[in-house]
Amino acid sequence: MASSPVGVPSPQPSRANGNINLGPSANPNARPTDFDFLKVIGKGNYGKVLLAKRKSDGAFYAVKVLQKKSILKNKEQSHIMAERNVLLKNVRHPFLVGLRYSFQTPEKLYFVLDYVNGGELFFHLQREHRFLEPRARFYTAEVASAIGYLHSLNIIYRDLKPENILLDCQGHVVLTDFGLCKECVEPEETTSTFCGTPEYLAPEVLRKEPYDRAVDWWCLGAVLYEMLHGLPPFFNTDVAQMYENILHQPLQIPGGRTVAACDLLQGLLHKDQRQRLGSKEDFLDIKNHMFFSPINWDDLYHKRLTPPFNPNVEGPADLKHFDPEFTQEAVSKSIGCTPDTMSSSSGASSAFLGFSYAQDDDDILDS
């Protein structure tokens, strides 16, 4: 299992009173009591993800519920707001999770997201250990399409790993968790925050050098390597030794791989970000690599390609692809309670001004 993301110091809020105000945003008037919260399906540093059924129409959603106090204690509010911003910019790309609502109570933040129940790629890798090349190629292509789309919006993802790659009920990829995304990075610009998950950190991040969007292509290479070989490329249980391996150890590719797969891994996992595949033409470099020659990218984008694996879920209540560690946990009653006072002018609530969001009614009805 991958380590938790490396902690990142948050930028200081822009307002003198400590609030983060993103300006006016629509208020959906949503309440926790609008939903029946059925099962815990995931957990993170600051809260949980729950399967929820909307009472008004019976629609199922994945609701990410975050504790404001935990976020503020760790000075992570800017990253939570950045995650919301990235979700808002996703105009329904087929391989990115969609945000339907976001709202808040005085104690909690709520992201109402598309419900995806085919399981994490991590879950399937744990069970099957490794994938054959055609299956790994399919997932890598769909993830690359999603990353390329984020880059086109000047967003660097920065935390690509099997735990953040979900499968939908048909077996297509859905990329989720945008908490470490960096916005507003132009193609020639760099950033320098030390963040990510240890197994997938690029050398330039470890060296604390300025880095650009090529950092995501390193992570894609690490995930592809893990799909084909069962472990990340420079894995060691000793994190310090693993960092040393990432920085200095030559890439070792076990036998049995095609020439195209080996060439792609060597290109994506090049230690010099300036020479890495994707450093010149970004997603086009990946798209045009010979490893993906069997892929019709237009058919891929429009989901006209049959996924190599079907999760065979029997409807929204089928949770067999979720870790029982989560699904067997009791749902806290406080998650579904709507406090008498839904707003506050100070404290935790004021740090998340501008958080609430609702899609247009037409979008909600069409979903």
From Swiss-Prot:
Query: What post-translational events are described?
Result: Activated by phosphorylation on Ser-356 by an unknown kinase (may be mTORC2 but not confirmed), transforming it into a substrate for PDPK1 which then phosphorylates it on Thr-193.
- What is the annotated localization of this protein? Cytoplasm; Nucleus
Where does it mainly reside? cytoplasm
Name of this protein: Serine/threonine-protein kinase Sgk2
Q: Which residues carry this modification: Phosphotyrosine?
A: Y357
Q: Give details on activation and inhibition.
A: Two specific sites, one in the kinase domain (Thr-193) and the other in the C-terminal regulatory region (Ser-356), need to be phosphorylated for its full activation.
**Transmembrane domains' residue ranges:** none
Report biased composition (Polar residues) as residue ranges. 15-28
Task: Tell me which residues make up the AGC-kinase C-terminal domain.
Answer: 293-367
To which species is this protein native? Rattus norvegicus (Rat)
Does this UniProt record's set of keywords contain Membrane?
no
- What keywords would UniProt list here? ATP-binding, Cytoplasm, Kinase, Nucleotide-binding, Nucleus, Phosphoprotein, Serine/threonine-protein kinase, Transferase
A cellular component term, taken from the record's GO annotations: nucleoplasm
Give the EC number.
Answer: 2.7.11.1
Query: Is the keyword Protein biosynthesis in the record?
Result: no
**What broad taxonomic lineage does this protein's source fall under?**
Eukaryota, Metazoa, Chordata, Craniata, Vertebrata
> Which residue positions does Phosphoserine occur at?
S10, S334, S356
